[in-house]
Amino acid sequence: MKRSFIGILIFLGLWLIMVQSCMKFRISDSKAKEQFEKVGVPLTTATVKLGSSQMHYAKTGNDSLPTIVFVHGSPGSWDAFSLYMQDKDLLKQYRMISIDRPGFGYSNFGDAKHIDEQSALISPLFNLWKNGKPIYLIGHSLGGPMLIQLNADNPGLCKGLVLLAGSVDPAEEKKEKWRYILDAGIISYLLPGAFKPSNKELIFFKKDIYSLQNKFAFVKCKVIIVHGTQDSFVPVGNATYAQSKLVNADSVRLILIPGANHFIPWTKYETIKQILLALN
């Protein structure tokens, strides 16, 4: 009996170690640079200390060009947009930067934050990136509402926003009460890798999405909303809702992709690429 109990403890210990080391949805700087080198694209990575926190990002392209900043969803990391950052056509027009949002990748991995707290950590980076040329923000899924928050916190910063399957409508946000169970005690430690901070920030977002509503009025640049009509994770109603809320935007263009799912940055790569090429 005693041996069985010890065996169970050892198994649980090994399981905890395994799940926390797997599925982090991130890539080391050295491996990423190696992959980019194979396609002939120099990659720069950096980690910036901000008090007790750190922000990690990757960059490609000429520093004298207009900038595209990619903001990933949940879970995820900067390399969700690797294909775009390697694209030779995009590189002719843009410098491209992709961040690890707080709690993911190498930006204090595991420490989930509310979106206003995330914005407070991301915003100082723009001072490092300013080059006198336009900045465009591209956000997928939970990266979509991050764009609204960032724009409100940094008035006049961006020339344009592109929301890809962005979650912004409180009425469309699923209750998902099971997330609170997964966040409780030892159960939370059984969640593998990036799923733990993802679960936590999605719990936060159930409240954050309401405080986000008064941020739309601060968006005064042009906005493009792209959404798949068959998105089962973030229903297409979010797209039309965003369009109705962006009353002060310079312009709002809604692009609905028939039959497309939630993963349009990858399943509809050419469509998104052409949208980005036409931004500037």
Stretches found by the model and what they are:
Residues 219, 225-227, 231:
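Short beta-strand/loop motif that positions the catalytic acidic residue
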Residues 260-269:
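Catalytic histidine-centered segment of alpha/beta-hydrolase-like enzymes
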Residues 98-135:
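Active-site loop/oxyanion-hole signature of alpha/beta-hydrolase fold enzymes
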Residues 221, 235-245:
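Short alpha-helix in the alpha/beta-hydrolase fold that links the catalytic acid
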Residues 230-234, 262-263:
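Acidic catalytic loop of the alpha/beta-hydrolase fold
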